[in-house]
Every structure is written in C-alpha cells, then in structure tokens.
C-alpha cells in the first residue's frame, strides 16, 4: 500500500472496529476524497457485511464514484457489492496481524 490516503483508510477502519466492538469495519474514500465508515450489522431480520454497510452510507451521501475501500476484522464476503458499483475501486483487507491483503 503506497498511497498515504489508503493508509488513512486503514486507520479509520481499524479505529472504527476497536471503538464499535463489531466483527467487521470498513472505510471508503469516494472520488472527491470524502471518507465514510461503517460496521457490519447482524440481527434476526438484517445482515449486512461491512462492505455492504459502508456502500449504503456512501450512496446515501450522494457519491458518484469510489476510489478505495479498506476492511478489517473478520473478512467481509461481499466485495462484489463494491465492485458492482465501482469496478476499478481498490479494495484492501487488513488482517488482525496488520498484514494488508
């Protein structure tokens, strides 16, 4: 990861995970440089992984494109949700060890 803006997303995602106590957290940077964070939501009637949740938050804010997304915690399964909206977006996962995948 060579982009310092992506490193900021790592910080946002890991701090959101630590603060929330959720299983997953994700941080997204849109094409204008604005950032969004979200965690997974799990209940009997609703299941969103962190990718789905952060995409929902960003879309509700009126984004027109995605540059990069970082997730941490347990690995979200639905990277396709991001790639469907922004096929060229960079998507990273940060393992508990700190390794960027």
Language-model segment annotations:
Residues 43-59:
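A short, polar/charged loop-to-alpha-helix boundary motif
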Residues 1-21, 56, 61-101:
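C-terminal binding/interaction regions
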Residues 24-34:
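Short beta-strand scaffold segments in enzyme catalytic cores
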Residues 28, 47-48, 69, 97:
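Residue-level detector of alpha-helical recognition elements and their boundaries
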């Amino acid at each position: 990861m060579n982009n310092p803006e992506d490193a900021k997303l790592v910080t946002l995602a890991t701090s959101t995970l630590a603060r929330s106590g959720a299983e997953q957290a994700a941080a997204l940077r849109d094409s204008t440089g604005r950032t969004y964070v979200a965690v997974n939501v799990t209940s009997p009637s609703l299941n969103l992984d962190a990718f789905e949740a952060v995409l929902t938050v960003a879309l509700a804010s009126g984004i027109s494109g995605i540059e990069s997304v970082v997730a941490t915690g347990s690995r979200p399964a639905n990277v396709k949700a991001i790639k469907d909206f922004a096929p060229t977006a960079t998507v990273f996962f940060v393992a508990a060890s700190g390794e960027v995948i």
